[in-house]
Amino acid sequence: MVQHLTAEEIIQYISDAKKSTPIKVYLNGNFEGITYPESFKVFGSEQSKVIFCEADDWKPFYEAYGSQFEDIEIEMDRRNSAIPLKDLTNTNARIEPGAFIREQAIIEDGAVVMMGATINIGAVVGEGTMIDMNATLGGRATTGKNVHVGAGAVLAGVIEPPSASPVIIEDDVLIGANAVILEGVRVGKGAIVAAGAIVTQDVPAGAVVAGTPAKVIKQASEVQDTKKEIVAALRKLND
């Protein structure tokens, strides 16, 4: 299983990161004689521009040239952000639109991350693992291979306090929709967590747990294969 960053390493990364407030500015007006700072990315025509820049850099620019602009629209979706979204260019996985994956998360080969899923810094999505819609992997939460994390499920994150142990999900585990796995819990290989379960203690390999708090109700070997099948075709990428 891939090793994740320690809590102390994540805290240091966030502390040292240059905080960013990126904005996108749409402009109509007269741009004659305008000099753009090197930090600006500028696109457009003689009458209209789109500028990508930091909010702090925009203010003095606007003070200098604002009288030349007729229409202004500014988009801002974060403030003093420390952690950017992950660059997925070289990620060999299926990532659907609307997934939020932060830098320093690890997405292994053949994984699937569905719409609305959130993968926080230091989390690990194992090879062939599916993170379903609106599921959340908190900081340092780690899954093994061929895991299914159901829609709306939560694997609790542990960055603060830094002494807490992360959630560990071993290979071939099925986690039902809206289940919650609390910090420090380890779910053993081949186990099944029922939908809506609140898991507060370690789950033995091959066990089925359900309820609030979750308790062992039977063994995964007693569950029909069709109800616990991991479908390889859903993880297939282009040939």
From Swiss-Prot:
Q: GO: which molecular function terms?
A: tetrahydrodipicolinate N-acetyltransferase activity
Which GO biological process annotations does it have? diaminopimelate biosynthetic process; lysine biosynthetic process via diaminopimelate
SUPFAM superfamilies named among the record's database cross-references:
Trimeric LpxA-like enzymes
The cross-references to InterPro entries, in alphabetical order and at most eight, read: DapH (IPR019873), DapH_N (IPR013710), Hexapep (IPR001451), Hexapep_transf_CS (IPR018357), Trans_hexapeptide_repeat (IPR050179), Trimer_LpxA-like_sf (IPR011004)
Q: What is its EC number?
A: 2.3.1.89
Task: Using the UniProt record, name the top-level EC class of this enzyme in a single word.
Answer: transferase
Task: Please write the reaction equations for the catalytic activity of this protein.
Answer: (S)-2,3,4,5-tetrahydrodipicolinate + acetyl-CoA + H2O = L-2-acetamido-6-oxoheptanedioate + CoA
Q: Which Gene3D superfamilies match?
A: Hexapeptide repeat proteins, Malonyl-CoA ACP transacylase, ACP-binding
Q: Which UniProt keywords apply?
A: Acyltransferase, Amino-acid biosynthesis, Diaminopimelate biosynthesis, Lysine biosynthesis, Repeat, Transferase
Q: In which pathway does it act?
A: Amino-acid biosynthesis; L-lysine biosynthesis via DAP pathway; LL-2,6-diaminopimelate from (S)-tetrahydrodipicolinate (acetylase route): step 1/3
Q: Which family does it belong to?
A: Belongs to the transferase hexapeptide repeat family. DapH subfamily.
Entries under NCBIfam families matching the protein: DapD_Ac
Q: What does this protein do?
A: Catalyzes the transfer of an acetyl group from acetyl-CoA to tetrahydrodipicolinate.
For this entry, the protein name equals 2,3,4,5-tetrahydropyridine-2,6-dicarboxylate N-acetyltransferase
Tell me which species this is from.
Staphylococcus aureus (strain Mu50 / ATCC 700699)
What gene, per UniProt, encodes this protein? dapH
